[in-house]
Amino acid sequence: MELSIQKIEALIRLSTIVMLVLTACLIGLDSQTKVIFYVQKKASFKDLRALVGLLYITSLAAAYNLLQLCCSSFSASYKGTSLQSYAYLAWLRYILDQAVVYAVFAGNLAALEHSFLVLTGEENFQWLKWCNKYTRFCTQIGGSLLCGFVASLLMFSIASISAFNLFRQYSPTKFMHLKL
């Protein structure tokens, strides 16, 4: 059973890496130039700070998941002897997985909120609607946000697996005592 959980976790991590890289590529390569009143105007992800932040967050999250995938493949071939050190590593993985899930989800929500302002505009602040002028730009950002939320769901399942791997080491009868 443990080997199948490791394989499932590796497959989910690989899928997460693909979705995060796809999100970062869709955001990073997104720009559109239009001629408006004989002036060329360019819409880019750099114009929206939330998209720049999401680009950095998804890139770091993909690197973290790649590192965890390499570490789990290494630890599958090497079995440690200390149960206590394995518990510390399980706690570290659990906390880092939780932090990465929250960071990616928060980055996606911030980018979604910023994208809604770009989509609808705001007259009080004199922010214009972009999506009626830059349709491909907005469509590509929408696709990247969809990929980002799918990656968040996949990372939530990874965090659930790491929680299972952590808490199954503890005794059900004695509080915070490792099983022997």
UniProtKB/Swiss-Prot annotation:
Q: Which residues lie on this side of the membrane: Cytoplasmic?
A: 1-7, 71-98, 162-180
Residues in compartment: Extracellular: 29-49, 120-140
What membrane topology term does the record carry? Answer: Multi-pass membrane protein
Where does it reside? Answer: Cell membrane
Q: Which InterPro entries match?
A: CASP/CASPL, CASP_dom
- Could you tell me the superkingdom of the organism this chain comes from? Eukaryota
Query: Which residues lie in coiled coils?
Result: none
* TM stretches of this protein: 8-28, 50-70, 99-119, 141-161
Alphabetical UniProt keywords? Cell membrane, Membrane, Transmembrane, Transmembrane helix
- Please list the disulfide bridges: none
Q: Which GO terms describe its cellular component?
A: plasma membrane
Q: What is its main location?
A: membrane
Quaternary structure and interacting proteins, as annotated: Homodimer and heterodimers.
NCBIfam families attached here? Answer: A_tha_TIGR01569 (TIGR01569)
Q: Which family does it belong to?
A: Belongs to the Casparian strip membrane proteins (CASP) family.
Q: What is this protein called?
A: CASP-like protein XL3
Gene label: XL3
